[in-house]
Amino acid sequence: MGQNNSTPLSLTLDHWKDVRTRAHNLSVKIRKGKWQTFCSSEWPTFGVGWPPEGTFNLSVIFAVKRIVFQETGGHPDQVPYIVVWQDLAQSPPPWVPPSAKIAVVSSPENTRGPSAGRPSAPPRPPIYPATDDLLLLSEPPPYPAALPPPLAPPAVGPAPGQAPDSSDPEGPAAGTRSRRARSPADDSGPDSTVILPLRAIGPPAEPNGLVPLQYWPFSSADLYNWKSNHPSFSENPAGLTGLLESLMFSHQPTWDDCQQLLQILFTTEERERILLEARKNVLGDNGAPTQLENLINEAFPLNRPQWDYNTAAGRERLLVYRRTLVAGLKGAARRPTNLAKVREVLQGPAEPPSVFLERLMEAYRRYTPFDPSEEGQQAAVAMAFIGQSAPDIKKKLQRLEGLQDYSLQDLVREAEKVYHKRETEEERQEREKKEAEERERRRDRRQEKNLTRILAAVVSERGSRDRQTGNLSNRARKTPRDGRPPLDKDQCAYCKEKGHWARECPQKKNVREAKVLALDDQGSRGSDPLPEPRVTLTVEGTPIEFLVDTGAEHSVLTQPMGKVGSRRTVVEGATGSKVYPWTTKRLLKIGHKQVTHSFLVIPECPAPLLGRDLLTKLKAQIQFSAEGPQVTWEDRPTMCLVLNLEEEYRLHEKPVPSSIDPSWLQLFPTVWAERAGMGLANQVPPVVVELRSGASPVAVRQYPMSKEAREGIRPHIQRFLDLGVLVPCQSPWNTPLLPVKKPGTNDYRPVQDLREINKRVQDIHPTVPNPYNLLSSLPPSHTWYSVLDLKDAFFCLKLHPNSQPLFAFEWRDPEKGNTGQLTWTRLPQGFKNSPTLFDEALHRDLAPFRALNPQVVLLQYVDDLLVAAPTYRDCKEGTQKLLQELSKLGYRVSAKKAQLCQKEVTYLGYLLKEGKRWLTPARKATVMKIPPPTTPRQVREFLGTAGFCRLWIPGFASLAAPLYPLTKESIPFIWTEEHQKAFDRIKEALLSAPALALPDLTKPFTLYVDERAGVARGVLTQTLGPWRRPVAYLSKKLDPVASGWPTCLKAVAAVALLLKDADKLTLGQNVTVIASHSLESIVRQPPDRWMTNARMTHYQSLLLNERVSFAPPAVLNPATLLPVESEATPVHRCSEILAEETGTRRDLKDQPLPGVPAWYTDGSSFIAEGKRRAGAAIVDGKRTVWASSLPEGTSAQKAELVALTQALRLAEGKDINIYTDSRYAFATAHIHGAIYKQRGLLTSAGKDIKNKEEILALLEAIHLPKRVAIIHCPGHQKGNDPVATGNRRADEAAKQAALSTRVLAETTKPQELIXPAQVKTRPGELTPDRGKEFIQRLHQLTHLGPEKLLQLVNRTSLLIPNLQSAVREVTSQCQACAMTNAVTTYRETGKRQRGDRPGVYWEVDFTEVKPGRYGNRYLLVFIDTFSGWVEAFPTKTETALTVCKKILEEILPRFGIPKVLGSDNGPAFVAQVSQGLATQLGINWKLHCAYRPQSSGQVERMNRTIKETLTKLALETGXKDWVALLPLALLRARNTPGRFGLTPYEILYGGPPPILESGGTLGPDDNFLPVLFTHLKALEVVRTQIWDQIKEVYKPGTVAIPHPFQVGDQVLVRRHRPGSLEPRWKGPYLVLLTTPTAVKVDGIAAWVHASHLKPAPPSAPDESWELEKADHPLKLRIRRRRNESAK
């Protein structure tokens, strides 16, 4: 190791191109990788003396060749390689040195091959001098005494194919060599050029012994080279895998060396994976991987083993360890398949195909577990090679015929042809230049042609005018003179010379001629062309020169420059008309303006035109001067300002005049930011930002930034860098930088998006003051103010170095050399905790100032400071001291925004003046300019903006109450006049907003409260002498629960609500509450039926506070003077009002009435058979008065309400006691029902309460009885008193009703509950109103005409007065029929062919309908001509297969085979399939013309009927899917009476349809309630009708023997699948065992069901057995006797 001597293998690899050429000449193909593998790893194992570094010794080559060419056990894949080696040795190329041509490079141990018996030529002197030991630090250990070399090698070697002598040394020592040079006379072998860890140090001590080995470690240079020259194992495992595989066979590493290689070349994770895979590949005794731990540890130890490498066993174990380690390397190198990485490998524009293939195969090896050189992977590699090649090569390869037969070499060869035939860059440029010139010539020719046509038209028109005006006398056309020759194309008409025209003739005199299309005036430009007005505009980033054409209506482009829209325009030109397209919107940039415009695309136009449309949009002006026409337009930039609506008032604010005296600037020069620069708080430690637990770095890529924006924020970034606020860094955190354009200027400011950082930083409690009550601590006596605004406040606080990497962002400035990340050294803006951190730091710094200056009041809101003092002197002194303190602390104040020692200042959006706060005119102007909203979001924005001013608006909540419902997105937005009035009233109230006094915390407060329409309104006041000054106007809407309370309780809720808001202004001072109710008595003795204990406790904690006192109602309550909608309530006593408003009925009792019957109600709900069953019942103690089951899923509470409601209805006009064991129903009737009704049946969350409909029904039914008492009784009692017994019976009746199918009310004496007006005179007779309602319901289901509907009603058993007029009225008022029915016209009655019985004669037709569900577009209609029965089937297609399928699957099984089928000549009916089916079935298929009434009138009329019915149903239901409505249309068609008064149903089935039976679906009922109730009644009727037929099935069966078979019987067993001509039964079989349902027989393993058996017929036996008694008691004698008769 470390020498530079070349070896045969390295020589061939260095000159591989020559080697491959020689192989090509030999008609073989070789690969570089296999060449190296065979030479260094494979052939040295043959035992013929082949060294790993190769040799040109012919004897060794021939020995390897014999093994390779063996018939059995040979290596055909190695044949090309050994043949090339032989050719190189026999005909050496020039780069083979002379010594290598005859040298035998082999070790003494490796010369035992077939060539060992041949005398070798004496070695020549070495080319290089002998080298001493290369280890620089220490000498190698002393060698043992060298033994004399053997005199001669063995005479005879083993024959080819014969195994070498087992006594010969094997293992790693077989190929080791010494590093020291040997003398030329030494016959032991040539010197090796490779340093090995295990090296032979001499001949073996014994003739057949092992060569002693000595350990030499790897050099650091080799390890460094291997580490640096190979990619990492994770990136490319093939590199290190090949390296270690070669090292294992060439360098003889020991166990320690292997560990050293693993430690240096691999990472910890890679090393563990390799060792794990290696231990999985340890082979057992059977040659397969073993799982035994002892064998694994023995073959592949993880700890250093005690192996002796000078013994055969040690060398064998080392060899096994190396092989296992290589197997582990290969196993760990397997990667999951990632074909996406393979598809990313594309051929470069100038990349040769062979290089691209090599890269592609390398990608396969790296990203897939496949070997691309394997035969099975060639197809995939070939497809990838074709698909990922360059476009021209890919196009060529895809066109090859028989592509599947091409190998990779063939594809590369074809690709090389295309690659080498490519045109060069110069050729491509030349070709493109010629094509451009050709296009230019064609365009010029077209333009010349068009101009020629135009001039010809103009000249001809002028000539015609001349002929009409000046040549009237001579209208004949002039002919040329006789003999005058015609002129050539380039001949002059004046001098007859060629090469010029007459106007350019030099011999012609300069005579001024009249010019065509020009004016004759003095001083004109003559024949020179006028300057054309042209402008250059940037369209989609491309500058284009336009010709200004005011005569053109539209602007024109010659090329679309992008997508073309669908719009087209016909253009009339001189050569005719043509259609041209329009472009989509294109972006134009004109100066600082940007507009979008659509252009007309006319490729034939000579130049782009700027028409009147774009000139108007640009407001262009065209000026004509001596220099030529000039086009100008308004170039003022359009600015867009985006801001929040609540900040819009700042646009209307007048700029605060700078009233700073220059003396202030001179006295404190270090505090003003304009002079002193950026500040730095010198007493605040650096801020440390704490992360959340588990937070990991996040890196958000920088968003793309325009050049303009980058240039705009560059000065700011550079300024921060110069000030040290920004510093370069390298951080795993990164957040994007956003350039924000400042309104009104082109300046940008950098804003960092710190949202991801804010998510990962711990939250701290915000201590920033609330601006709502900040001014409450300002005494009204302080009327002199100073306002200071700190400049760059957050940047005054330093950021701890450990926290700075969190706020890194990416910034590139090539001009300044800044590329990478920057971060903040100060507290950044946009960080969520910055306001709190700065507010706390500034508050701590200013604490000494507050303590030393009690004469002034200092208010701080983050970086806004307010100094208030009672006098100017105090204010000035306090302001000076504050400025001095701020300068000392390191803060900076903005001189532009400072307001010093003034009586009127603006602070936090308020105007402070004379101890009061006012709304600024800017805020009022903002609200006044808001237009009426059109969306819920705009309503919320208006209420939010106006809500900021609600302290100045009396009763703001009342004014805004109509607008609150419009803020919800879930309801439709409808702006009505009521909303507009509320909108205007809020604006008007804002204009008259008064001044509010600042709260004086030294005085008590008075709160006047009033409640109107669910809104709490109040005024917070303080006394000033004899007057009360308002501090704030308060108003708030009550929650839905409190809104439903009585007036007195709503007043309590209003006081509690407003008192909480007033506490924000009073800061816990004493408050006196004045209202128009005796609130204190209500709060101290609250009612127990209106509010929960939690709510009452909350109210008591607020109102029964020692600082809250209640005063008697005042004569004049300022709160009641607020605008109200009704008069004030009269004077009352709250306790009486609450008692009156508690119940729903004053005489409702909760104790039984004496001498009154008692009913017991109960509801039951339970789960049976996985379903929740429910029922309700009423009993009177002896019998059931009413019982019914309820819909599935009904709760027990709902069932109780239903039972109680039904009892109240049945007791209408009576005196009754009703008992219920439900607390829910009892409380609803007595207490909660009234409360629910008052607050709109809403919960505290504003949602509908449960069982809303049942509660409303109960509240209405309570008033029906004459006198009623609803009593609560305990449930499930075991006593014998009447109440307990009645309750138990009611409970049992409810449970039975729940299990039954009865779902309708069942009354004992219904006649007692019917009013006299409702008593029917005859059974079945209806009142006119009920009759009309019945007809309407029937018409809604059928939509029949008046005649058919009248026939249908007459078939019922109902008697309806004025039936005909009612039918005509109902049908004439039907909107769906009016919109669908056609106008009837008189026609003569025709005749049609009909069948003589049902199912004989059918007519069939297709009709097209609009697309419906599942893609159905057609309707296949069959109609029986005899009965009129119709069948209709939705279909997707109109084909013969569909017709045949419906005939076979629908018509034949149900109606039989028809004799005649009639249809038109449609393709589906005349097809061979349809006619063939008719022939096979014997159907006479009659074809006729379409729409012929005599032949197909019945089916055509039915098509119309079905379509009309579907249309009516769709109009009524609003549904669009006609497929779902088709069954209802068929119901109408099948139950419509015909001309004989019979419906198709009656003709076909011989009876009326179920819907016409009395009491059916349409039958009237005393309680004619909703549709669901009617359908349930119909279900009961149907169940009653069919019960008699099916009840026999449900009777319990008789106890009988299930089958007659007994043990010992002979039975026959049925075959499951009898074959052709095979009996159905098999057997007989003997019965062995029986069960009630199955039988076990002899000969069949499985049990046989009794239904598959029958008794076998009796037969005469041919033999019998007899039992005879024997003498021995334990013996029996059985005798067989032949039956002679059976023979």
Curated annotation (Swiss-Prot):
GO BP, sorted A to Z: DNA integration; DNA recombination; establishment of integrated proviral latency; proteolysis; symbiont entry into host cell; viral genome integration into host DNA; virion assembly
Biased composition (Basic and acidic residues): 420-451, 479-490
Cofactor entry: Mg(2+)
Residues the UniProt record annotates as site (Cleavage): 128-129, 196-197, 455-456, 517-518, 641-642, 1310-1311
Motif stretch (PPXY motif): 140-143
Reaction equations catalysed: DNA(n) + a 2'-deoxyribonucleoside 5'-triphosphate = DNA(n+1) + diphosphate; Endonucleolytic cleavage to 5'-phosphomonoester
Residue ranges constituting the Integrase catalytic domain according to the UniProt record: 1394-1552
Protein name per UniProt: Gag-Pol polyprotein
Species per Swiss-Prot/TrEMBL record: Woolly monkey sarcoma virus (WMSV)
